[in-house]
From Swiss-Prot:
HAMAP family with a match to the protein in the record: UvrA
Name under which the protein is recorded: UvrABC system protein A
Binding site for ATP: 38-45, 649-656
GO annotation (BP), single: SOS response
Organism: Methanothermobacter thermautotrophicus (strain ATCC 29096 / DSM 1053 / JCM 10044 / NBRC 100330 / Delta H) (Methanobacterium thermoautotrophicum)
Gene3D superfamilies tied to this protein: ABC transporter ATPase domain-like (1.10.8.280), ABC transporter ATPase like domain (1.20.1580.10), ATP-grasp fold, A domain (3.30.1490.20), P-loop containing nucleotide triphosphate hydrolases (3.40.50.300)
Lineage, broadest ranks: Archaea, Methanobacteriati, Methanobacteriota, Methanomada group, Methanobacteria
Pfam hit, one: UvrA_DNA-bind
Main function: The UvrABC repair system catalyzes the recognition and processing of DNA lesions. UvrA is an ATPase and a DNA-binding protein. A damage recognition complex composed of 2 UvrA and 2 UvrB subunits scans DNA for abnormalities. When the presence of a lesion has been verified by UvrB, the UvrA molecules dissociate.
Coiled coil location: none
Places the protein is found: Cytoplasm
Length: 962
């Protein structure tokens, strides 16, 4: 039956009921580009990821053995009747790659693996000391070099036969015995071959055969014996000889028939292999930083974040946490001050350099310390260790996780002083192709790397050797360019990628794999992508389809929807009001369907209108001076206060660096006097006009099911107080804490207030069942007996915001908070809905609602990074209304955005560019949308088209916001 479905070209879904899906029946065409759209919370992800992908993945995992299944994340069977016609499913979602410091763009895409192979095969090694190209050594040259040693020195001639390979290697020992050898060196220790060897087969071992043991002499007889031994060692060691010195333990020279420096430096290389260029292998990794490229060290700027303070005012933060002036550390500093003759009341930055250095790094001079404790005085003469060395010592020696975490707050990553951040050994960095090392190549932008390999000049022999490797490298670089990531470098750490960038990298990797007959499910691949690059992304998706794959894309981007072969519109509302297929068919059929809200926006029946009037600058500005982090080119940026400002620009132009790394962190540091490691800039002016800065992003409002909209917005506190004031609760002496499921007393102790019990199934998916004691209600029976207007606390948490708004209409402090949730379009979510089940867009709107419910000071700076992620046209209209309310109250909103509906609605635009990466980092246009549209920038060009479609005349500029 399944085979027939696949041959008939359809994926058939019957009775899908996962989450809010309402018994959905659907037939999707195979080998097509399908878009699933609908408003936030309508059930798109429930259909695409939690039903179609989950079932495809579950069936694959079930085909494996029970032993293998226990090591894989088994997915639970979705709520549905059946699905037919599924192919193997691959999900490419918005989740960022794992924050592994060893993971880079190059390793994720496997381009770095091909680069390692390329450099190993055609790279030219150089001496990293003198710079000369490495030459091969003959056995005669090796003998000459050994003869140069001092007469009388004892040496051993070793031939490496096993290098870092797992196994017991018994056959190696037998072969050496048969050849008449007497001794071997195993893992650095000399043994007789007659010994019994019991090596751990799961560990890597190195074995060298002892060919000869000699005392260096200058005569002919010695030279002949040495030459014979070297020839034998070269034969056994496949061209490599090791000569450890018995007079200097640990010193060992390596001679090779393959690579050795012809100059006086005498540098010798082992055979050049791909692992020599891997920073994850001891053969390639820098020994100082172990291939990380950076070292975690105590940062003086974090130890003394506010040098304008004196030591008595707490300048040395880690030694001031108690706030007491008579503590142990303060007594030490007082002794240092008395010894050197400076005052603890002098601002730290005004102290002499010698005194600052003595405080931070210690002194060689002995100082008399006087310690007072429990009315006793102790005197001791000793050297002062210094704040930073003491912290480093405690960090290394302590077994306390708390102490390591605390000291970790004062540490930051610095480029490794040995490799300079390249991660590799000097030998690896000295191998070049066309004058470029592998580090030089990965530091290029992807576009520059593509141009480098396209124009590579090789000999005929090198071209023949590298043909297939170069083909793979060029293709994969081209795929990354096609998905709009040409500005990234191959060395970029995966942990610094946005969700959209990480997803498009995985997309490019999948295209490179060339798989056919696969079901790909993508989550908004257009996020983070400028309109200029959107067309290339769509062409890439079509190429993946044309290979013979089915693409299901959850998307809201208009151009992507219109480019699809088939569109499914889920709705009509969100939550309980959604979960149905409102319309499906070609984009044209969707546009003509009167029931489709998406179709109404696509056809122009519904629009996000331009604002009637734009707010005018009040003359007050927040000015960032000398922004120079990442690719920003020491720019000054003026942000008008009291306005809705959009920061735009092509991908990689520097928007996130400017707004998140510099503006948000810089303002937060200054307003809250807490170090946030802000990006490089000179100053931020105009802070006297704002009292706080708030970042409203799409991160979850909580990491556990205990967190929910009611607890996050604070409305649950008022609700618990209401229950505590009921006559029955007062009679029993119940306080508000009784109605919390986070503390003992009122919660069900069988499930700890979770309402569910987790049952581990090992090789099957974990099963979550309702608690048998409280039946999923979280509270014990005594607590549930307390009722407010006929409802107990569990029933109130099960209400939607819409229902609760009506229920609490006479309680102002509850109604006000619920009203803001309703106003941002979240009337359908339940008060007690676990935070883990909220989408990114829903979480962001809960945060917006919380801000709206606060009593406005009119002086808050709100920062949002791509708030339209996961939002439908209709959701964006609601978002703009909410942002308008915040700004109308006198606050300032700064939004990073690519969505043209948001950009056209802004009061002010700051456009960065002109391109991404090194070709970006400048302010290329600023002003009203009309003024930016008149510029020649990429954003201006697309904005001009949108404004021309909407209305021909300019939007009038309104009154001053101040």
């Amino acid at each position: 039956m399944e085979t027939l479905r696949i041959m008939s070209g359809k994926i058939v879904i019957k009775g899908a009921r996962e989450h809010n899906l309402q018994n959905v029946d659907l037939e999707l065409p195979r080998d097509k580009f399908i878009v699933i759209t609908g408003i936030s919370g309508s059930g798109k992800s429930s259909l695409a990821f939690d039903t179609i992908y989950a079932e495809g993945q579950r069936r694959y995992v079930e085909s494996l053995s029970a032993y293998a299944r226990q090591f894989l994340g088994q997915m639970k069977k979705p709520e549905m009747d059946y699905i037919e016609g599924l192919s193997p499913a691959i999900s490419i979602d918005q989740k960022t790659t794992r924050v592994n410091p060893r993971s880079t763009v190059g390793t994720i895409t496997e381009i770095y693996d091909y680069l390692r192979l390329l450099f190993a095969r055609i790279g030219k090694p150089h001496c990293y000391l003198c710079g000369r190209e490495i030459e091969q050594q003959t056995s005669t040259q090796i003998v000459d070099r050994i003869m140069d040693d001092g007469e009388g020195e004892r040496i051993i001639i070793l031939a490496p036969v096993v290098r870092d390979r797992k196994g017991e290697h018994q056959r190696v020992f037998e072969r050496l015995r048969e050849q008449g050898f007497v001794r071997v060196r195993v893992d650095g220790e000399i043994h007789d071959l007659e010994d019994e060897f019991d090596l751990d087969r799961n560990r890597k071992h190195s074995i060298d055969v002892v060919v000869d043991r000699l005392v260096v002499r200058r005569d002919t007889e010695f030279r002949k014996r040495l030459a014979d031994s070297v020839e034998t060692a070269l034969q056994l060691g496949e061209g490599t000889v090791r000569v450890p010195s018995t007079m200097t333990p640990g010193e060992e020279r390596i001679y090779s028939e393959h690579f050795a420096c012809p100059g006086t430096a005498g540098i010798n290389f082992e055979e050049i292999s791909p692992r020599m260029f891997s920073f994850n292998s001891p053969h390639g990794a820098c020994p100082e930083c172990n291939g990380l490229g950076s070292k975690l060290e105590i940062d003086p700027d974090l130890v003394v974040p506010y040098p304008e303070r004196s030591i008595n005012e707490g300048a040395i933060v880690p030694w001031s946490k108690s706030g007491k002036r008579d503590n142990y550390y303060h007594q030490m500093l007082r002794a240092v001050a008395e010894h050197y003759g400076f005052s603890l009341d002098t601002p730290f930055r005004d102290l002499d350099e010698e005194h600052r250095r003595a405080i931070l790094y210690g002194t060689d001079e002995k100082i008399q310390f006087v310690f007072q404790r429990k009315n006793r005085t102790y005197r001791v003469n000793r050297r002062f260790e210094g704040v930073i060395p003491r912290m480093e010592r405690i960090y290394m020696e302590t077994k306390s996780n708390y102490m390591r975490t605390y000291i970790g707050r004062f540490m930051s990553n610095h480029a490794c002083p040995v490799c300079g951040g390249s991660r590799l050994r000097p030998e690896s960095l000295s191998v070049t192709i066309n004058g470029r090392s592998i580090h030089d190549v990965v530091e290029m932008s992807i576009r520059e790397a593509h141009e480098f390999f396209d124009s590579l000049k090789l000999t005929e022999r090198e071209e023949y050797i590298a043909r297939e490797v170069l083909k793979e490298i060029r293709e994969r670089l081209r795929f990354l360019i096609d998905v709009g990531l040409d500005y990234l470098t191959l060395s970029r750490s995966s942990g610094t990628l946005s969700g959209g960038e990480a997803q498009r990298i995985r997309l490019a990797t999948q295209i490179g794999s060339g798989l056919v007959g696969v079901l790909y499910i993508l989550d908004e691949p257009s996020i983070g992508l400028h309109q200029r690059d959107n067309r290339r992304l769509i062409e890439t998706l079509k190429r993946l389809r044309d290979l013979g794959n089915t693409l299901i894309v959850v998307e809201h981007d208009e151009e992507t929807i219109l480019s699809a072969d088939h569109v499914v519109d889920i709705g009509p509302g969100a939550g309980e009001h959604g979960g149905c297929v409102v319309a499906e068919g070609t984009p044209e059929e969707i546009m003509e369907d009167p029931d489709s809200l998406t179709g109404a926006y696509l056809s122009g029946r519904e629009t996000i209108p331009l604002p009637e009037v734009r707010r005018r600058p009040s003359g007050r500005y927040l000015t960032v001076r000398g922004a120079a982090e990442n690719n920003l080119r020491e720019i000054d940026v003026r942000i008008p206060l009291g306005l809705f400002t959009c920061v735009t620009g092509v991908s990689g132009s520097g928007k996130s660096t400017l707004v998140n790394d510099i503006l948000y962190r810089g303002v937060y540091e200054r307003l809250n006097h807490k170090h946030m490691n802000a990006g490089r800039h000179t100053d931020i002016e105009g802070l006297q006009h704002i009292d706080k800065v708030v970042m409203i992003d799409q991160s979850p409002i909580g990491r556990t099911p205990r967190s929910n909209p009611a607890t996050y917005t604070g409305v649950f506190t008022h609700i618990r107080e209401l229950f505590a004031q009921t006559p029955e609760a007062r009679k029993r002496g119940y306080r508000p804490g009784r109605f919390s499921f986070n503390v003992k007393g009122g919660r069900c102790e069988a499930c700890g207030g979770d309402g569910i019990i987790k049952i581990e199934m090992h090789f099957l998916a974990d099963v979550y069942v309702p608690c048998e004691v409280c039946r999923g209600r979280r509270y014990n029976e005594e607590t549930l007996e307390i009722r407010y207007r006929g409802r107990n606390i569990a029933e109130v948490l099960d209400m939607t915001v819409e229902e609760a708004l009506e229920f609490f209409e006479n309680i102002p402090q509850v109604r006000r908070k619920l009203q803001t949730l309703y106003d941002v379009g979240l009337g359908y979510i339940k008060l007690g809905q676990p935070a883990t089940t909220l989408s990114g867009g829903e979480a962001q709107r809960v945060k917006l609602a919380k801000e709206l419910s606060r009593r406005s000071t009119g002086s808050t700076l709100y920062i949002l990074d791509e708030p339209t992620t996961g939002l439908h046209f209709d959701d964006i209209k609601k978002l703009l209304n909410v942002l308008g309310r915040l700004v109308d109250a006198g606050n300032t909103a700064v939004v990073i955005e690519h969505n043209l509906d948001v950009i056209k609605s802004a009061d002010h635009i700051i456009d960065l560019g002109p391109e991404g990466g090194e070709r970006g980092g400048l302010v290329v246009a600023e002003g009203t949308p009309e003024e930016v549209a008149a510029s020649g920038t990429h954003t201006g060009r697309f904005l001009r088209e949108v404004l021309a479609d909407e209305r021909s005349q300019k939007v009038p500029v309104g009154q001053d916001t101040g």
